[in-house]
Amino acid sequence: MYAVIATGGKQYKVGEGEIVRVEKLPGEVGDTVRLDQVLLFSDGENVKVGQPTVENVAVDAQIVEQGKAKKVLVFRFKRRKGYRKKQGHRQPFTALKINKIEAGA
């Protein structure tokens, strides 16, 4: 059983018991999150594709980590002019453990 969910402007294929890193969601570690933007749902035999979302299907997940990704360095310069600019960015993320995919929720 798996589902394709939309959160943070991105789409993720998830199954029960998996840990998925998504864009930052509000909440503390241990909180439960209900994701109801399910774009596709498969129970092993049948596949339901939403237009745009599948009705009565939701994904229950638990927050296992709130963190920041590895640093990405952005370096800009203009040759022969002495212009150099170095900037770093760490994108915040939320790690979710998928507890249950509920059909008919």
Swiss-Prot record:
Keywords: Ribonucleoprotein, Ribosomal protein, RNA-binding, rRNA-binding
Gene Ontology MF terms: rRNA binding; structural constituent of ribosome
SUPFAM superfamilies given in the database record: L21p-like
Short name of any one Pfam family annotated for the protein: Ribosomal_L21p
Coiled coil: none
Keyword RNA-binding: yes
GO BP field: translation
One annotated Gene Ontology cellular component of this protein: cytoplasm
Main function: This protein binds to 23S rRNA in the presence of protein L20.
Quaternary structure note: Part of the 50S ribosomal subunit. Contacts protein L20.
Protein's name according to its UniProt entry: Large ribosomal subunit protein bL21
Protein species of origin: Desulfatibacillum aliphaticivorans
Lineage, broadest ranks: Bacteria, Pseudomonadati, Thermodesulfobacteriota, Desulfobacteria, Desulfobacterales
